[in-house]
């Protein structure tokens, strides 16, 4: 009987109930709330669901992220190995390849001025960088946090891993993902505040047709030019353009379909669960998380405002031919930001079709955010 009682006592004490802190229970509730949003309200479920489940797992069973050096048998936790793919920049780069395979750069090629709007929207990144320095973060942490301003989830993870700021990767990833999802809520008030009714009603001329040759040359030329100037961008820009070359060449249909579908979804599962697993109670429930979330919001708002204001400048310089609303699409939340430009423009004039014009700055923003990340890597000597 004593043996049975002792065995039962050991089993009971090995349950998670005896090993978790109040913080773990808080994070379990947060994870369940995120799962509710993903399943019941379909709030960007492709990423939110695996992130939330990773968050749930690590706060119930922290050893699922156990480092091999701390394991009795030398084997790390399952999600630790998933996470190493984030840390080594493999998963974010593969995400970029999938995005490239799904992206049509035609609107950007047809209107190269869109590059300027995409660049202007990156202002929020550098505003957040100096804000983070002011709040007491060191320079590398500030750089990792600032990329949230581009509303680019994979790039945020990529830079945080490259700069060795894995301790704050969870809050950065959650903030970046949240603002990417909240584009339709955050952007419209800023866009309406900074533009007049007359400006919002401006109709832009139809974009010129883009030839197949131009579409094939674009990823090759961008890779050569950008990577020669800033070699540190090669993992992101290179993979983005490789995926796009798959799409536009027309000779590797199977690779295009795999990169944009099967491989993309596999990577999203690995990326989402591993990033969610970085949000343990110890890493997430602290003052720095609140600072990161606040900085991310400020950065995103600054980026949106900078894009719109630069759009207004281009409107004046073009004699009223450019609608400033497309400037807000310069953040790299593709295609949500472009759809918001279309929606806000249609509210002033239902016959105004801005979507294709906004896609130019939108895809330029993807390149711009990758370049900003590469710039920080070059500054800090990280390759």
Question: Could you say what each language-model-derived stretch is?
Answer:
Residues 107-129, 280-307, 358-362:
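Entry/N-cap segments of selected transmembrane alpha helices
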Residues 167-185, 295-303, 326-329:
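Alpha-helical transmembrane segments
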Residues 223-307:
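Transmembrane helical segments that form the transport core of multi-pass membrane transport proteins
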Residues 60-80, 97-109, 131-142, 282:
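Transmembrane alpha-helix boundary signature
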Residues 1-19, 25, 75, 189-218, ...:
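Intrinsically disordered, low-complexity non-transmembrane regions of multi-pass membrane transporters
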């Amino acid at each position: 009987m004593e043996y049975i009682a002792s065995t039962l006592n050991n089993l009971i004490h090995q349950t998670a109930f005896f090993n978790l802190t109040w913080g773990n229970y808080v994070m379990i509730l947060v994870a369940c709330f995120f799962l509710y949003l993903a399943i019941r309200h379909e709030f960007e479920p492709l990423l939110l669901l695996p992130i939330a489940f990773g968050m749930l797992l690590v706060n119930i069973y922290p050893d699922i992220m156990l480092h091999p050096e701390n394991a009795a048998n030398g084997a790390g936790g399952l999600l630790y190995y998933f996470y190493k793919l984030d840390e080594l920049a493999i998963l974010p780069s593969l995400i970029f390849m999938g995005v490239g395979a799904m992206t049509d750069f035609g609107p950007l090629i047809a209107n190269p001025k869109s590059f300027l709007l995409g660049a202007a929207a990156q202002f929020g990144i550098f505003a957040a960088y100096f804000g983070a320095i002011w709040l007491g973060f060191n320079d590398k942490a500030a750089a990792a946090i600032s990329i949230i301003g581009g509303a680019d989830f994979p790039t945020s993870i990529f830079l945080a891993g490259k700069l060795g700021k894995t301790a704050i990767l969870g809050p950065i990833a959650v903030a970046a993902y949240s603002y990417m999802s909240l584009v339709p809520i955050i952007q419209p008030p800023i866009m309406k505040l900074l533009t007049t009714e007359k400006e919002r009603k401006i109709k832009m001329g139809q974009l010129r047709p883009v030839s197949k040759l131009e579409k094939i040359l674009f990823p090759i030329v961008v890779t050569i030019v950008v990577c020669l100037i800033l070699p540190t961008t090669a993992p992101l820009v290179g993979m983005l353009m490789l995926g796009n070359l798959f799409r536009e060449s027309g000779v590797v249909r199977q690779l295009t379909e795999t990169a944009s579908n099967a491989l993309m979804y596999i990577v999203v599962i690995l990326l989402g669960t591993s990033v969610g697993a970085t949000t343990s109670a110890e890493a997430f429930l602290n003052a720095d998380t609140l600072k990161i979330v606040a900085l991310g919001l400020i950065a995103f708002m600054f980026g949106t405002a900078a894009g719109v204001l630069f759009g207004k400048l281009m409107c004046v310089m073009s004699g009223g031919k450019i609608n400033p609303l497309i400037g807000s699409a310069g953040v790299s939340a593709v295609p949500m930001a472009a759809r918001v430009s279309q929606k806000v423009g249609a509210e002033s004039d239902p016959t105004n079709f801005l979507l294709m014009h906004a896609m130019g700055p939108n895809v330029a923003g993807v390149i711009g955010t990758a370049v900003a990340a590469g710039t920080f890597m070059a500054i800090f000597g990280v390759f």
